[in-house]
Amino acid sequence: MATTNDAPTSLVGKTFDCSFGQFVPRLTVLSPTELRVQATIGATEIDEVVQSNLTGVRPGLFIMNWTEQGGNFVVQVQDHDNKVVHNYARLADGQVFCVQGAIQAVQT
């Protein structure tokens, strides 16, 4: 289990896999305002650094949002204590992608 508190800086430097079935994006928190997103969607590979907003709600619970270079806008509620992530995305083509999955710290 990741050791976190409600300060966004507690996630800085940490990497997490968000498991949504076969779709498993990897997120690395570079700062409270910068995030590295790595994912494979079909034949498309994403590896980009994006501007993000990270807010602590309570110890172990965070809300994070970012816009990917392709135009997808993503909001996540990350519950690190219970290892659950809720993902809400407005895709660039207008579709909405809402899913719940597991979040797991990755040792790098």
Residue ranges and their predicted role:
Residues 2-24:
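Tryptophan-anchored aromatic micro-motifs
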Residues 65-108:
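Beta-sheet ligand-binding and adhesion/scaffold domains
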Residues 17, 25, 31, 83, ...:
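Polar, enzyme-active/binding microenvironments
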Residues 6-9, 22, 32-37, 87, ...:
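Long, compositionally biased, intrinsically disordered segments
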Residues 43-78:
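Contiguous, well-ordered beta-strand patches that form the walls/edges
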Residues 25-55, 91:
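N-terminal glycine/threonine-rich, aromatic-flanked beta-hairpin/loop signature
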Residues 15-21, 37-41, 63-68, 87-90:
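Short beta-strand segments that buttress and anchor functional surface loops
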Residues 11-12, 28-36, 57-60, 77-84:
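Short, solvent-exposed coil/turn segments at beta-strand boundaries
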